Design a protein with these regions (language model features):
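Interaction interfaces in information-processing and related assembly proteins
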Residues: 2-97
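Cys/His-clustered metal-coordination modules, chiefly Zn-binding fingers
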Residues: 91-157
């Protein structure tokens, strides 16, 4: 079998998670959500602006020995609603699913209204409700009713 010289192969991971179909350019934000930093001790592979039939261009993050929590999935969904998760075990995909935008977000997004009670020293957690999903997902603050685009919102990490 002949391999296309322009194709780059990245080795498989034994156990972990592959986050695929990330909005192009958003891989660094996904890494922040997942707490991946320079001192991360497992294998982390990031591919950015990869050609995609589905999205035109996409980012991919492969993480060995990392399984995602529900909070992580919700945060990823807010910045990359078309992302897919592949759970890997013994080098095989054992589960594959798409993220979905949560109806309610608590303590995930920061309200852009600096006067909102969720930004005060009162210790009130942010609380947003999904307003609509197309063309861009937008969430409305429960307290001040500020509308925020999910892909431009500041995440609370």
């Amino acid at each position: 079998m002949e391999q296309d010289a322009s194709e780059l192969k990245v080795s498989k991971i034994r156990r972990g998670t592959v986050v695929d179909h990330i909005t192009a350019g958003m891989a660094p934000a996904v890494l922040r959500i997942l707490g991946i930093h320079a001192g991360f001790s497992s294998v982390a592979v990031v591919a950015m602006n990869v050609k995609s039939d589905k999205l035109g261009y996409k980012d991919i993050v492969k993480l060995e020995q990392v399984m995602l929590t529900e909070d992580m999935l919700q945060m990823i969904a807010t910045i990359a609603p078309q992302a897919t998760m592949n759970v890997i075990d013994d080098f095989q995909i054992v589960e594959k699913y798409e993220v979905s935008l949560p109806e309610v977000l608590r303590s995930i997004l920061k309200c852009p209204n600096r006067h909102c009670i969720s930004n005060s020293s009162e210790g009130v957690a942010s609380h947003f409700a999904l307003e609509h999903t197309a063309p861009i997902a937008e969430y409305r603050c429960h307290y001040c009713e500020e509308l925020v685009q999910a892909d431009r919102a500041e995440l609370i990490l």
